[in-house]
Amino acid sequence: MKFISLRTAPAAAFAVALTAAFALASTVLVPFAHAEEVGSVNTNFRITGSDRVVVEAYDDPLVQGVTCYVSRARTGGVKGTLGIAEDPTEASIACRQVGAIHFSGPLKQQADVFSVSMSLIFKALHVVRVVDTKRNALVYLTYSDRVVSGSAKNSVSAVPMPAGTTIPLK
């Protein structure tokens, strides 16, 4: 029989509460990314689900006419099938003008545009939009983070605005 010391009980309770808070925050604070999977390739065959690289399209919600394509690894196997696998942190991004540019409103100088979970609780992939006013371009940066530590692995893409189009700023 294992006894818990009264000195360690508050620490254990704090750890459980902190874990629950992070789990709740990850479901509430990380918005659901509306991705459209446009393609994928298998990289490692498994009977229970192959590892693969997927390409997803994300339309910028505030800038009509701009789509970002993100490629990233998805873990297969039993854990991947159940949705509890932790996907690798590597991702690549390419953003393009795919139609007429229209702004839904003024943009922040820098804003988190998309987030998608890469593990059950603790890891997310982000796409951040940065306005480069000097060059009249929208710059999109992708990176991943964890509750404890992030990743320096990142990728960047820029979409120049057509001549005569000014980016409205807040």
For each predicted feature, which ranges?
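Mature extracytoplasmic domains of secretory-pathway proteins
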Residues: T67-V131
